[in-house]
Design a protein with these regions (language model features):
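N-terminal Lys/Arg-rich, disordered targeting/topogenic segments
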Residues: 1-10
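Serine-dependent acyl-ester chemistry module
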Residues: 7, 40-65, 210-348, 355-359
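Hydrophobic membrane-insertion alpha-helices, especially the h-region
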Residues: 14-30
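Conserved SGNH/GDSL esterase-like catalytic core that processes O-acyl groups on lipids
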Residues: 102-122, 135-137, 143-234
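Solvent-exposed, polar/charged alpha-helical surfaces in well-ordered, non-transmembrane soluble domains
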Residues: 157, 161, 187, 191, ...
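Membrane/wall-proximal cationic-aromatic binding patches
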Residues: 39-162, 341-344, 351-352
Length: 385
């Protein structure tokens, strides 16, 4: 009798457990097939849940930025969590971004499109480029990613066009491999480099990090990576990839007002070590490194400049290197000049740098990318002869 009762209890338990598993599995399938994207609320704004992977101080500053500009920029929905890098572009996506800059000009700036490949990196809207003898690899942050402009208008894409147009033979043609992502630091650059096996003799590698390295944070990028890839970190991370679980996590209010000691995502000494290691790694493969600083200030810019001098490699500092072009921009880029002048109006007269920058005074716009390509091309042309 007792044994029969025990069997009944076990059957009841198994039935209940199976029902629960089936229910949650069904909900998970519905979420995934419907394209459901969990979000958490900050004031009146819905922020995609993958951003929970960010350092809490970085996330808090983004929330404050959103509240200040009055909307969540559409491009943040192009990303997903990634165990190695924290996040990457969703694979095989195509998204057109319309609201992405200052609220004062959000309806006046042209839209731009983000297209990714199977590995979660940005590519041309026409698909992967054909294989050439040489490659230009770009490891950088949002400016090298081309935030705010189409892929074909980024400085690296325009640079490859110029190099190939001036090449004496097809063996001197380059293909572009842009592995840059917004928010990436030199630490994530070293992680990228460890997986970058296609670099070969005669290639060029642009390294462009600094702004995100110096950004305030609660933990360093290295600490974030080690925590995420510890045993418990991997368990928690894999749980967060279950949409139903991630959706339930969004019910709690996000933390705010975090107290933290002053620190940066990548301390200056680590920044130096990362850049030096990247430069040496490029040279070991027979490729040619170039350091490009965009919106990289103070001691981080000085460090990048010193490394370039010590290693005897080209160094470019943007946007200051573009200032000499200000008097001729309207002749070089007449259509784009009109577009941005109509967007900024008197603001461009008060701040001429808006001719080639977005309102954040940091990211290059289409004109800025065009000028950067011209400046870089002159150096590349001399070095490739």
């Amino acid at each position: 009798m007792a044994q029969q009762k025990r069997k009944k209890i076990i059957r009841s338990f198994l039935f209940s457990a199976t029902t629960v598993i089936f229910f949650f599995g069904f909900v998970e399938l519905v979420f995934r097939f419907s394209g459901f994207e969990p979000v958490f609320q900050y004031k009146a704004y819905a922020i995609p849940s993958w951003m929970e992977e960010l350092d809490p101080v970085v996330l808090e500053k983004y929330q404050q930025f959103v509240a200040g500009q009055g909307f969540v920029n559409e491009d943040v929905y192009a990303y997903e969590a990634d165990l190695r890098y924290g996040y990457k572009l969703k694979p095989n996506i195509s998204i057109t971004v319309r609201n992405y800059s200052s609220a004062y000009v959000v309806d006046k700036l042209p839209p731009w499109t983000v297209v990714s490949n199977t590995k979660g990196f940005r590519v041309s809207s026409s698909g992967e480029a054909k294989t050439e003898e040489k490659s230009l690899h770009v490891l950088g942050d949002s400016s090298s990613f081309g935030w705010g402009v189409d892929y074909e208008k980024t400085y690296s894409s325009l640079l490859v066009e110029k190099l190939n147009a001036s090449a004496s033979s097809s063996s001197d043609h380059f293909e572009l491999r842009n592995l840059s992502l917004p928010g990436f630091s030199s630490f994530q650059g070293t992680l990228l480099w460890q997986e970058l096996g296609e670099v070969k003799n005669g290639d060029w590698v642009i390294l462009s990090f600094g702004w995100n390295d110096s950004f305030p944070s609660y933990q360093t990028d290295r600490q974030q990576f080690e925590s995420r890839n510890s045993l418990m970190g991997k368990i928690n991370w894999n749980l967060r990839q279950i949409l139903f679980f991630r959706w339930m996590r969004t019910w709690r209010l996000p933390e705010s007002g975090l107290e933290y000691k002053a620190g940066s995502r990548v301390p200056l000494t680590q920044y130096r070590e990362n850049l030096e290691a990247l430069v040496e790694g490029v040279r070991e493969k027979g490729a040619k490194p170039v350091l490009v600083s965009v919106c990289n200030f103070a001691e981080y810019q000085d460090t990048a400049r010193q490394i370039a001098g010590n290693k005897n490699i080209p160094f470019f500092n943007f946007p200051s290197s573009l200032e000499p072009f200000l008097p001729t921009v309207h002749d070089r880029f007449p259509d784009q000049f009109v577009t941005y002048f109509e967007a900024y109006g008197e603001g461009m007269e008060a701040d001429p740098m808006l001719v080639f920058l977005f309102p954040d005074r940091c990211h290059p716009n289409e004109i800025g990318h065009g000028l950067m390509a011209e400046v870089l091309f002159e150096t590349f042309k001399r070095k490739t002869r």
